[in-house]
Amino acid sequence: MTDYKATLNLPDTAFPMKAGLPQREPQILQRWDSIGLYGKLREIGKDRPKFVLHDGPPYANGTIHIGHALNKILKDMILRSKTLSGFDAPYVPGWDCHGLPIEHKVEVTYGKNLGADKTRELCRAYATEQIEGQKSEFIRLGVLGEWDNPYKTMNFKNEAGEIRALAEIVKGGFVFKGLKPVNWCFDCGSALAEAEVEYEDKKSSTIDVAFPVADDAKLAEAFGLASLSKPAAIVIWTTTPWTIPANQALNVHPEFTYALVDVGDRLLVLAEEMVEACLARYELQGSVIATTTGSALELINFRHPFYDRLSPVYLADYVELGAGTGIVHSAPAYGVDDFVTCKAYGMVNDDILNPVQSNGVYAPSLEFFGGQFIFKANDSIIDKLSEVGSLLHTETIKHSYMHCWRHKTPLIYRATAQWFIGMDKEPTSGDTLRVRSLKAIEDTQFVPAWGQARLHSMIANRPDWCISRQRNWGVPIPFFLNKESGELHPRTVELMEEVAQRVELEGIEAWFKMDAAELLGDEAPQYDKISDTLDVWFDSGTTHWHVLRGSHPMGHETGPRADLYLEGSDQHRGWFHSSLLTGCAIDNHAPYRELLTHGFTVDETGRKMSKSLKNVIEPKKINDTLGADIMRLWVASTDYSGEIAVSDQILARSADAYRRIRNTARFLLSNLTGFNPATDILPAEDMLALDRWAVDRTLLLQRELQENYGEYRFWNVYSKIHNFCVQELGGFYLDIIKDRQYTTGANSKARRSAQTALYHISEALVRWIAPILAFTADELWEYLPGERNESVMLNTWYEGLTELPADFELGREYWEGVMAVKVAVNKELEVQRAAKAVGGNLQAEVTLFAEAGLTADLAKLSNELRFVLITSTASLAPFAQAPADAVATEVPGLKLKVVKSAFPKCARCWHCREDVGVNPEHPEICGRCVDNISGAGEVRHYA
């Protein structure tokens, strides 16, 4: 038997079938570094329009988790796609470096008695070490960026820039000092930002407490009675017994109805709607003897249960009837609403009782409970209330309660003197910060759209921003306060610039070691130098100032306003939030045009990632076993707007999808053997109809992909590329052209036409996958024929694709119809193979019984219809002539019949043809193959 293998154009490529990503990706990273890829991108982008994605800084502590990887990969995919779209899209990664978590780590390692200077020194060293570790992990993901010059909030220039940003906000009239209840952590010894608060379940003691009336006559009058027949008391309900020693008022709703209830030995004031539930809870019988409105009770005095002082009734709209008694006890030092109400009634700061010290222990001077930790004092307080006859009921409940995000310990509201940025304070000029911010939200694009309402609600309802902290490792608030008036120095903004200049040279240490006289001269004795530091959310929230127009100026056409901020959905109350406030305070607009939020990673059952559940997926493990491109493909394949599921099984599915895409790319490369684009490419008008359709289909898909990349719909990009590879290419086009590729002359028009199409498809595909499969795209790029630059990323979307003319006879709709027919034929061939009626498809002969219109369409392919259907013979017959055993199909007006060919099999092309052996010199092959070997070669027109 003659071996005709040498006469075939068999596929051949050095592009490996096995990706070996864990080993290959580090080599590609080294190559990117050696050619200075990021620098070259900046060089070619000089004259392009700029797209600025500003990096939300991760905290410089610990190794990265899968959520970090997701975030960085999303950013990289956007910037790569923008680069391919013709933008200059730089990426300056950043780190958040100050704050309690790092200070806490240092204290745990070295102890709490280091001294402030040593603490700052060790914190800076620790953050530097952590950044280096995280940086290498981010680079391993294939993220291109300015890794040699990232921004760090602890860089001297950034620290100075933050002080300058604060000066701008001071200049705008937004900053003030005030006594207000703030989130307070005893372990931190400091106020916390809203974004540093987590909610966890906590067990608490609830108590119903009676406050005896002090003004009997006024209470009787309020209820329309001549006098009170018995002792009377008003009843409150609270989940914080420890606040009772600080009670200073009682709040009722002005519009609620309140009842005077006779319970035998005394009269109780309760909200009418709560009487039945309260009496049941107290196990008392009683009857309502009178009712009145809350407003009638205003300013009536009651007595504190165990201290010799009065608690007046104040009106408050925040009182609710969902639980309790309808009366709220007010400790203004430990509740925001309480504080606001008491201040509205004229209570001055000096009158506010605040017996809880910064460590959570009552001041020694507090009668009965001095020196006790507040949560441990609950039992003592309950006992005291019982002793004086004021305790009506107590029980333990489990409820959601605020905790410190770092220590996981319960927080309290605690009134302290702090620095605030006022939401409703009248600024030097223009609207209040709240009004500015709400307007800015309306001018911002949100992806997904629901983020707008969420951020709007948060801004509309948030309190003033407490920006001061009582810690060492933070950017200082460089204020001088007049010892007598408590006012800021009149040259505060000017002095802040002097401090900023020193900090730019020496870091924040410059402020802490500075003597006031250095700046104030003879005035120094009149002023206190403030030791507070700034909230870390102010650090990151002002990066638009100290990075985008400071350490890393972007030179955007419209100023230092980023096109995009992209972070997890928790940043609506974090970085998005703080950046919005500072941007509006300084520039009267948001520092971003668009906000994109992604959800959190969960396992495939929807559970949060937790070491205790053993469902944590570490990025390093994925890199070491599957490769970063598999992780990137997983990110791209998932709708990030909600929770994002990840597990070994899900990643395995991503790996399968990757293999299908890689195999398609390998097939394309292997069939471009011997193809030189400079000499072998055919103009569109010389290509076969099917090849022109394939290029046209590629062009249409490229337009869809560009649109989806532009809208950050990566899951659509992934799906469309995957389907194109598997269905339109693998399931249709590539299958059909194999015969032509392998059997026609190496330099024939039939083969060069297909190779031209494959080349165009390859040039497009390598760019399509580049934002997602960053490593594989550059690997593929090196194997493509023709001269090319060093990386696919140094190019834009492929422009060599041509569109089918509108009047082209075998146009888009035509090939859609042919595909449907091919699907129907394949389905029947599978049935026949399963029944062992035929072996391979090329053993089959198919007859298509079609209605006249379909017959006319299929007849346009002439004798090339068999190549499209990949059968040895394909015949057309009228639909009416279909025999009883013809199979109906899903294609209207089409039945078909498949039989095994009776003709011999060609040893070269494997088609079963009646002319096999007709040529005595080649007794084992068909006439077509003889012509392709030694004759003029077959001529194809369509497929």
UniProtKB/Swiss-Prot annotation:
<dbReference type="InterPro" id="IPR050081">
    <property type="entry name" value="Ile-tRNA_ligase"/>
</dbReference>
<dbReference type="GO" id="GO:0002161">
    <property type="term" value="F:aminoacyl-tRNA deacylase activity"/>
</dbReference>
<feature type="binding site">
    <location>
        <position position="926"/>
    </location>
    <ligand>
        <name>Zn(2+)</name>
    </ligand>
</feature>
<dbReference type="GO" id="GO:0005524">
    <property type="term" value="F:ATP binding"/>
</dbReference>
<feature type="binding site">
    <location>
        <position position="929"/>
    </location>
    <ligand>
        <name>Zn(2+)</name>
    </ligand>
</feature>
<dbReference type="GO" id="GO:0008270">
    <property type="term" value="F:zinc ion binding"/>
</dbReference>
<keyword id="KW-0436">Ligase</keyword>
<keyword id="KW-0862">Zinc</keyword>
<feature type="short sequence motif" description="'HIGH' region">
    <location>
        <begin position="58"/>
        <end position="68"/>
    </location>
</feature>
<feature type="short sequence motif" description="'KMSKS' region">
    <location>
        <begin position="608"/>
        <end position="612"/>
    </location>
</feature>
<protein>
    <recommendedName>
        <fullName>Isoleucine--tRNA ligase</fullName>
        <ecNumber>6.1.1.5</ecNumber>
    </recommendedName>
</protein>
<dbReference type="InterPro" id="IPR009008">
    <property type="entry name" value="Val/Leu/Ile-tRNA-synth_edit"/>
</dbReference>
<feature type="binding site">
    <location>
        <position position="906"/>
    </location>
    <ligand>
        <name>Zn(2+)</name>
    </ligand>
</feature>
<keyword id="KW-0030">Aminoacyl-tRNA synthetase</keyword>
<dbReference type="InterPro" id="IPR033708">
    <property type="entry name" value="Anticodon_Ile_BEm"/>
</dbReference>
<dbReference type="InterPro" id="IPR002300">
    <property type="entry name" value="aa-tRNA-synth_Ia"/>
</dbReference>
<dbReference type="InterPro" id="IPR013155">
    <property type="entry name" value="M/V/L/I-tRNA-synth_anticd-bd"/>
</dbReference>
<dbReference type="InterPro" id="IPR002301">
    <property type="entry name" value="Ile-tRNA-ligase"/>
</dbReference>
<dbReference type="GO" id="GO:0005829">
    <property type="term" value="C:cytosol"/>
</dbReference>
<dbReference type="InterPro" id="IPR001412">
    <property type="entry name" value="aa-tRNA-synth_I_CS"/>
</dbReference>
<keyword id="KW-0648">Protein biosynthesis</keyword>
<dbReference type="InterPro" id="IPR014729">
    <property type="entry name" value="Rossmann-like_a/b/a_fold"/>
</dbReference>
<dbReference type="Pfam" id="PF00133">
    <property type="entry name" value="tRNA-synt_1"/>
</dbReference>
<dbReference type="GO" id="GO:0004822">
    <property type="term" value="F:isoleucine-tRNA ligase activity"/>
</dbReference>
<comment type="subunit">
    <text>Monomer.</text>
</comment>
<dbReference type="GO" id="GO:0006428">
    <property type="term" value="P:isoleucyl-tRNA aminoacylation"/>
</dbReference>
<dbReference type="InterPro" id="IPR010663">
    <property type="entry name" value="Znf_FPG/IleRS"/>
</dbReference>
<feature type="binding site">
    <location>
        <position position="611"/>
    </location>
    <ligand>
        <name>ATP</name>
    </ligand>
</feature>
<comment type="similarity">
    <text>Belongs to the class-I aminoacyl-tRNA synthetase family. IleS type 1 subfamily.</text>
</comment>
<feature type="binding site">
    <location>
        <position position="567"/>
    </location>
    <ligand>
        <name>L-isoleucyl-5'-AMP</name>
    </ligand>
</feature>
<dbReference type="GO" id="GO:0000049">
    <property type="term" value="F:tRNA binding"/>
</dbReference>
<dbReference type="Pfam" id="PF08264">
    <property type="entry name" value="Anticodon_1"/>
</dbReference>
<keyword id="KW-0963">Cytoplasm</keyword>
<keyword id="KW-0547">Nucleotide-binding</keyword>
<comment type="function">
    <text>Catalyzes the attachment of isoleucine to tRNA(Ile). As IleRS can inadvertently accommodate and process structurally similar amino acids such as valine, to avoid such errors it has two additional distinct tRNA(Ile)-dependent editing activities. One activity is designated as 'pretransfer' editing and involves the hydrolysis of activated Val-AMP. The other activity is designated 'posttransfer' editing and involves deacylation of mischarged Val-tRNA(Ile).</text>
</comment>
<dbReference type="InterPro" id="IPR009080">
    <property type="entry name" value="tRNAsynth_Ia_anticodon-bd"/>
</dbReference>
<keyword id="KW-0067">ATP-binding</keyword>
<feature type="binding site">
    <location>
        <position position="909"/>
    </location>
    <ligand>
        <name>Zn(2+)</name>
    </ligand>
</feature>
<dbReference type="Pfam" id="PF06827">
    <property type="entry name" value="zf-FPG_IleRS"/>
</dbReference>
<keyword id="KW-0479">Metal-binding</keyword>
<dbReference type="InterPro" id="IPR023585">
    <property type="entry name" value="Ile-tRNA-ligase_type1"/>
</dbReference>
